[in-house]
């Protein structure tokens, strides 16, 4: 029997990749599992530059977004901005997810809420990885906050690369296939897994499987982790073709 799901996305206003990669993964899945279909519904929070100040101001708009998406009776809500959550201190994703879920319930459209920040932590743990190496587009101080957040979750970051791109639109214009070369400068010798993009706005999907095959290590991203958590929350098989180990259907 056919099943249809509405995916609600809470998106920074300048983010162009969340609404590209997440639908791409689930549409790719639909080709192989046609009886499970998805539509995508977004609400935006204002943000142009990836600074701690703008991110905190943007996060205040997430409540409105959750209520708007619950008006559409979405089956699950995904909060796209990893660094907006992580720059507010360890464990903030749990507070944010609980608050937003409560707002959807108060609005009569109760839905589970996941965040890319929480999803990445869960994705790393699901793979059984204790140590990771990562690539992020952020300026180094923000990358350091991401590393601190991940470390506080009990995961060691053995190496990182910061691309230092402050303009969020420019982050979204990056060629994902460049990551195949960039990752060669990442020390993965002590890592159990590699986070190819610790940012939902930095495109990486076309490179995930290629880099995983190249390194012989599990490779994930903020976006693949978000899709994994979306599928888990809907009690669906966690399978997307050619999207790395996390979405192989094994976990």
From Swiss-Prot:
InterPro entries: Iso_Racemase_Enz_sf, MaiA/AMDase, Maleate_isomerase. The modification S-(2-succinyl)cysteine is found at residue 81. One of its GO terms (biological process) is protein homotetramerization. Gene3D superfamilies: 3.40.50.12500. One of its GO terms (molecular function) is maleate isomerase activity. Transmembrane segments: none annotated. It comes from the Bacteria. Its EC number is 5.2.1.1. The active site is at residues 81, 199. Keywords: Isomerase. Homodimer. Belongs to the maleate isomerase family. HAMAP family: Maleate_isomerase. This is Maleate isomerase. It comes from Geobacillus stearothermophilus (Bacillus stearothermophilus).
């Amino acid at each position: 029997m056919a099943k249809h799901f509405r995916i609600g996305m809470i998106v920074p206003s300048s983010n162009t990749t969340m609404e590209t990669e997440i639908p791409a993964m689930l549409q790719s899945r639909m080709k192989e599992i046609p009886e499970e279909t998805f539509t995508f519904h977004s609400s935006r929070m204002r943000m142009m530059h990836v600074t701690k100040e703008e991110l905190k101001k943007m996060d205040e708009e997430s409540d409105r977004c959750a209520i708007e998406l619950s008006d559409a009776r979405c089956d699950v809500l995904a909060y796209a901005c990893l660094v907006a959550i992580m720059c507010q201190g360890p464990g903030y994703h749990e507070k944010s997810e609980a608050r937003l879920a409560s707002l959807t319930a108060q609005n009569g459209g109760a839905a589970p809420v996941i965040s890319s920040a929480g999803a990445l932590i869960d994705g790393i743990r699901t793979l059984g990885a204790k140590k990771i190496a990562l690539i992020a587009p952020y300026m180094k101080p923000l990358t350091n906050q991401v590393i601190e957040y991940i470390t506080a979750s009990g995961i060691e970051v053995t190496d990182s690369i910061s691309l230092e791109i402050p303009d969020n639109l420019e982050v979204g214009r990056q060629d994902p296939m460049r990551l195949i070369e960039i990752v060669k400068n990442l020390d993965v010798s002590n890592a159990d897994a590699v986070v190819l993009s610790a940012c939902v706005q930095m495109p990486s999907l076309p490179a995930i499987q290629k880099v995983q095959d190249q390194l012989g290590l599990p490779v994930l991203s903020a976006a693949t982790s978000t899709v994994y958590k979306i599928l888990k929350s809907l009690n669906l098989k966690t399978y997307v073709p050619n999207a790395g180990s996390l979405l192989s259907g094994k976990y």
